[in-house]
Amino acid sequence: MIFDPKMLQVYLVGGTQDVHNDVVKFLEKVELAMKSGITAFQYREKGNSKLRPNERVDLGLELRTLCTHYGIPLIVDDDYELAQQINADGVHVGQNDTKIEQVSVAVGHQMFIGYSCNTPEQVERANTMDFIDYIGCGPVFPTKSKSDADTAIGINRLERLNMISERPVVAIGGIDEENMKVVHDTGVAGLAVISLVFDSKDLVATVKKMKNLYK
């Protein structure tokens, strides 16, 4: 699948740890989100996940089937070997994950690559790497979804990072229904969320509100 910045508009991130390690519930919520209009899904099995390596592959293959059915790109967080095993469309790499250059060499042109950047220096460095397709910036606000989350960067820095970046930017971290518009209005290409969707009492309506921002 060829990368398109529009893929970033309604970008759902998650793993079984986000639904109390209930695999069935996880797949049900992901599929409902796909039916409702998310534009990308990132498989992120971290934190309190209880899945063994082989179970991660099996679940990844089920996600691959769902993403293909709904025409949505499947992105894997950090683990490029898992991404290759399940034929993912992309891989997302954090500053503290596997070295971005190593990932680029491993996946070549088989997948698009996202890279987390939270400072102007990190963005400027990313601008020099032609193999990076998009940048993830955050957490914009404090978040409980990631146990290893950095300090919140705030709206002003997000806006600055978006201006500096030569790649499309997706914002993540602490985004909710109250602040999603102010995040969108910074000019970012998309919003990435975890708990906003997985914890929503009306998942369909939540996804539609996000989609409406980019109409």
UniProtKB/Swiss-Prot annotation:
GO molecular function: magnesium ion binding; thiamine-phosphate diphosphorylase activity
Entry's EC annotation: 2.5.1.3
Keywords of the record: Magnesium, Metal-binding, Thiamine biosynthesis, Transferase
Residues where 2-[(2R,5Z)-2-carboxy-4-methylthiazol-5(2H)-ylidene]ethyl phosphate binds: T143, K144, S145, G174, I194, S195
InterPro entries: Aldolase_TIM, ThiamineP_synth_sf, ThiamineP_synth_TenI, TMP_synthase
Positions bound to 4-amino-2-methyl-5-(diphosphooxymethyl)pyrimidine: Q42, Y43, R44, E45, K46, D77, S116, K146
UniProt catalytic activity: 2-[(2R,5Z)-2-carboxy-4-methylthiazol-5(2H)-ylidene]ethyl phosphate + 4-amino-2-methyl-5-(diphosphooxymethyl)pyrimidine + 2 H(+) = thiamine phosphate + CO2 + diphosphate; 2-(2-carboxy-4-methylthiazol-5-yl)ethyl phosphate + 4-amino-2-methyl-5-(diphosphooxymethyl)pyrimidine + 2 H(+) = thiamine phosphate + CO2 + diphosphate; 4-methyl-5-(2-phosphooxyethyl)-thiazole + 4-amino-2-methyl-5-(diphosphooxymethyl)pyrimidine + H(+) = thiamine phosphate + diphosphate
Organism domain of life: Bacteria
GO BP terms, alphabetized: thiamine biosynthetic process; thiamine diphosphate biosynthetic process
Single GO cellular component term: cytoplasm
Binding site for Mg(2+): D78, D97
Biochemical pathway: Cofactor biosynthesis; thiamine diphosphate biosynthesis; thiamine phosphate from 4-amino-2-methyl-5-diphosphomethylpyrimidine and 4-methyl-5-(2-phosphoethyl)-thiazole: step 1/1
Cofactor note: Binds 1 Mg(2+) ion per subunit.
Entry cofactors: Mg(2+)
Class of the enzyme per the UniProt entry, highest EC level: transferase
One Pfam assignment: TMP-TENI
Family, as annotated: Belongs to the thiamine-phosphate synthase family.
Biological function: Condenses 4-methyl-5-(beta-hydroxyethyl)thiazole monophosphate (THZ-P) and 2-methyl-4-amino-5-hydroxymethyl pyrimidine pyrophosphate (HMP-PP) to form thiamine monophosphate (TMP).
Xref: PANTHER family: THIAMINE-PHOSPHATE PYROPHOSPHORYLASE, THIAMINE-PHOSPHATE SYNTHASE
Descriptive protein name: Thiamine-phosphate synthase
Species this chain originates from: Limosilactobacillus reuteri (strain DSM 20016)
Gene: thiE
